[in-house]
Regions:
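Short, aliphatic-rich beta-strand segments
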Residues: 218, 225-234, 292-296, 396
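Extended interfacial segments that mediate partner engagement and assembly in macromolecular machines
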Residues: 76-88, 97-203, 223, 238
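Terminal RNA-binding accessory module
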Residues: 7, 11-92, 382
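Short, solvent-exposed loop/turn elements at beta->coil junctions and helix N-caps
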Residues: 133-141, 206-207, 213-215, 219, ...
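Short, conserved phosphate/pyrophosphate- and ester-handling motifs at nucleotide-, phospho-/glycolipid
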Residues: 56, 181, 304
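Hydrophobic beta-strand signal
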Residues: 60-62, 149, 328
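Rossmann-like S-adenosyl-L-methionine
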Residues: 2-26, 35, 240-472
Length: 472
């Protein structure tokens, strides 16, 4: 039976130029990077995306996927290297999906992330005059994660494996180190891996939906060094929990909380809704500036504490608080940014849809004796209209939504509220740009500052200042 070869014919201006076929080896010069950090080579204007390639490099690559409008290539050889290329320090980098940019100098990473924001805002929508600052980076862009979520599995020989997922899969790469995790977290991971094997504790199997241990989660207070260890289990029965607790307490004296989180769902969601404390406190503490925060196993808290302080300080600079302003903190979570601003504001109102987060925010306000704060549970668009009817008129609104961005209903309600300034923090500049087009009806997008919260990855966070047009 003859081999079937699939060809893609390239057409430019109706003229057929060249054929591209899967498994073909080609050479070319990288002219750009995608938002995922992949190098772009063009053959007669047809784009080919090659991971781990850098701009201006001459490379040899193999075509591994060919589509009508693009192809994916695999880097075989770098014929001429970019000055921005470095040797990745992590031995798992070629396989692990956790990092995408370790082959790039840190300076080049910061430049690439700013360029992403420039491409989004200067080339689409009415934002060509918006100032986009240099990316705020880290002095040491390693070991920055204060939370590690580590999947647990078993090898073919029934040995416990722990690490992170292979690129674009749920295959666990067994690891004993990770250069972006807190060093203590990898030490806990390695000891727990040994004990799970030693005690013959059953491990969850994604295919059969059986077994007990699904994930190990470790959280650390960056400024307090308090540590929380969480066993995510497929069910409540955890007979050997006491043995594990005693081993952890003995070996890691700074552990102040050990918890079990129950996740019976057959999904990719890591944590379930029910938790119980096996040892110590229900929460750990961390501190940003002068504010102390209580953090539970389910709390949303920024992963990179040192960069969070820079992010919030930039937001504070944009807010221009003098002590006379009413601040509205939407999507407030456990109150992190609202409480950070409270010492410099007249009053801070926070709204969040998650009841436990509001309780945590109130507890954090009490802990810090910040009496000029009010937190309420509900949809932001509903609660802020209630506050408006009560005569509460904010001068500054803080917006920090999830990756999907803001609901359009919320944005139209925000326009009715008409504050002087809006400070919008985003973990997804694409949805921030979409939302900015709605706000542009009444607001000038004055400035955006990218902040590198996740070095060695393609992720970028931004903080943007919107000023009401009659205030300019």
């Amino acid at each position: 039976m003859p081999h079937i070869i699939f060809l893609t014919f390239l057409y430019v201006g109706g003229k057929k130029l060249e054929t591209i076929k899967k498994n073909e080896v080609k050479t070319g010069k990288v002219i750009d990077l995608t938002h995922e950090g992949h190098g772009v080579v063009k053959v007669d204007r047809y784009p080919i995306f090659i991971p781990n390639a850098l701009i201006d490099e001459e490379i040899k690559f193999k075509l591994i996927k060919v589509k009508k409008n693009f192809a994916i290539g695999k880097l075989i050889e770098v014929i001429s290297e970019s000055d921005d290329r470095v040797t990745p320090p992590c031995i798992y980098y070629a396989k692990c999906g956790g990092c995408q940019l370790q082959h790039m100098t840190y300076r080049a990473q910061l430049d690439m992330k700013r360029e992403q924001v420039v491409n989004l805002f200067h080339r689409k929508g009415p934002f060509e005059n918006t100032v986009i600052k240099e990316t705020i980076g880290m002095v040491n862009p390693w070991r920055y994660r204060n939370k590690s979520q580590i999947p647990v599995g078993q090898s073919n020989s029934n040995q416990v494996i722990m690490g992170f997922y292979r690129q674009r899969s749920h295959d666990i790469i067994d690891m004993d180190s990770c250069l972006i995790q807190d060093r203590q977290h990898q030490e806990v991971m390695n000891r727990v891996k040994y004990w799970l094997n030693e005690l013959n504790i059953s491990i969850y199997n994604e295919k059969t939906k059986t077994g007990l241990i699904r994930h190990l989660v470790v959280r650390t207070g960056y400024h307090t060094d308090e540590m929380m260890v969480i066993f995510v289990t497929n069910g409540a029965t955890f007979k050997q929990s006491e043995l594990l607790v005693n081993k952890l307490k003995k070996e890691f004296p700074n552990i102040t909380s050990i918890k079990q989180n129950i996740n019976n769902s057959h999904s990719n969601v890591i944590m379930g809704r029910q938790s119980m404390t096996l040892y110590g406190k229900d929460k750990i503490e961390d501190q940003l500036s002068e504010v102390i925060y209580h953090i539970s196993d389910l709390s949303f808290y920024q992963i990179n504490s040192s960069q969070t302080e820079k992010l919030y300080q930039q937001a504070l600079n944009y807010a221009q608080l003098t002590g006379k302003e009413i601040v509205l903190d939407t999507y407030c979570g456990i109150g992190t940014i609202g409480l950070y601003m409270a010492p410099l504001a007249k009053h801070v109102y926070g709204v969040e849809v998650v009841p436990q987060a509001i309780k945590d925010a109130e507890d954090n306000a009490t802990k810090n004796q910040l009496k000029n704060t009010t937190f309420e549970c509900g949809k932001a668009e509903d609660v802020i209209l209630t506050w408006k009817s009560q005569g509460i008129k904010p001068d500054v609104v803080m917006v920090d939504p999830p990756r999907k961005g803001c609901d359009e209903t919320f944005l139209t309600t925000l326009l009715k509220l008409n504050p002087k300034r809006i400070v919008y923090i985003s973990c997804n500049p694409s949805t921030q740009q979409r939302d900015a087009q709605i706000l542009a009806e009444q607001y000038e997008l004055v400035e955006i500052t990218p902040v590198d919260m996740f070095p060695q990855t393609t992720h970028i966070e931004t903080v943007a200042l919107f000023v009401r047009k009659d205030e300019e």
